[in-house]
């Protein structure tokens, strides 16, 4: 298959809409990361996403819409909490898990009776949804397990020959996938952290928002994944990543004792020159927004530089930094060392 990479204009948006209507795949930019879109109602089209990514089909996908009216048929009920959160954060990087409606393919939801829905703010996604009339399922546009792409070039590296079209809309602003929150049950619960934080949602809802244990630790054997990325290793570069938890001095000393061929440091701004091995920063210490924006791009850069072993500085685990820690701990296959 020949994969075209086209700049965003009326013609390329019309082509993307036509392909989606025909049951084909399109990769396109969102404000979070680049995604692979297919008609969420068309099970055969959605299966192509799993094939293109090499992704297990028990990993649910998120449905993307461009207006509240599109929820009809996608969900069977819009809880009051969802209406409040939508008013505050849609369009934007928030996915809400609600009872599944009759129009969504079972393949999209991995057989669950719930579905995650998001209204993205990126103008390209909105334009394609409007032009096609299709609510689409769209995970990140990477091969399964690799870091999510935040630009068209990295998307092409993974998806060349796997789908017909990539729309080049420049760099994604946020850099990590959306927050996923389940809005049914006694309390809302974060299933995947992102740019919209626990604290922000609590301020809107006036109630506690719980955090699922699988955000910062592995799922237990036999436990069902309720959200994307809960079950499998994700976001990983080719190198073995280990997170080092402790002071900068302890981090530097640990790396000095483990230096060798192919060893790299993944650190914070301003620390690179103080380390005994090649180093690359993923943002300002304590600044979850900058860390989130840079993380996946930097993990892919480590691949390009031939890193074999990466020792990463540990981010915080609250606010937007919770999303960074969640991605990094999975890239490290939960290898964390106290130093």
Model-derived regions, located:
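Active-site-adjacent structural elements in enzyme catalytic cores
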Residues: 1-339
């Amino acid at each position: 298959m020949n994969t075209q990479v086209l700049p965003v204009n009326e013609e390329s948006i019309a082509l993307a809409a036509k392909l989606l209507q025909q049951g084909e795949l399109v990769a396109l930019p969102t404000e979070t990361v680049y995604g692979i879109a297919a008609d969420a109602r068309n099970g055969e089209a959605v299966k192509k996403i799993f094939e293109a990514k090499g992704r297990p089909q028990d990993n649910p996908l998120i449905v993307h819409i461009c207006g509240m009216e599109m929820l009809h048929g996608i969900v069977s009920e819009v809880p009051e909490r969802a209406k409040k959160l939508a008013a505050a954060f849609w369009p934007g990087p928030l996915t809400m898990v609600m009872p599944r409606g009759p129009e969504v393919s079972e393949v999209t939801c991995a057989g669950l009776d719930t579905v995650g829905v998001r209204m993205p703010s990126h103008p390209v996604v909105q334009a394609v949804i409007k032009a096609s009339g299709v609510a689409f399922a769209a995970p990140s546009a990477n091969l399964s397990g690799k870091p999510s792409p935040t630009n068209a070039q990295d998307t092409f590296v993974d998806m060349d020959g796997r789908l017909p079209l990539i729309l080049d809309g420049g760099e994604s602003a946020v850099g990590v996938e959306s927050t996923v929150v389940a809005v049914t049950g006694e309390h809302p619960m974060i299933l995947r952290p992102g740019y919209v934080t626990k604290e922000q949602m609590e301020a809107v809802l006036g109630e506690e928002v719980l955090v699922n244990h699988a955000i910062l630790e592995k799922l237990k054997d036999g436990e069902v994944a309720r959200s994307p990325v809960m079950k499998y290793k994700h976001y990983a570069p080719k190198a073995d990543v280990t997170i080092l938890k402790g002071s900068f001095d302890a981090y530097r000393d640990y790396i000095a004792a483990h230096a060798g061929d192919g060893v790299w440091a993944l650190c914070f701004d301003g620390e690179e020159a103080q380390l005994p091995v090649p180093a690359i920063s993923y943002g300002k210490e304590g600044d979850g927004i900058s860390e989130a924006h840079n993380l996946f791009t930097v993990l892919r850069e480590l691949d390009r530089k031939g890193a074999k072993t990466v020792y990463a500085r540990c981010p915080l685990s609250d606010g937007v930094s919770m999303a960074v820690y969640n991605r990094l701990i999975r890239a490290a296959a939960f290898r964390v060392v106290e130093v």
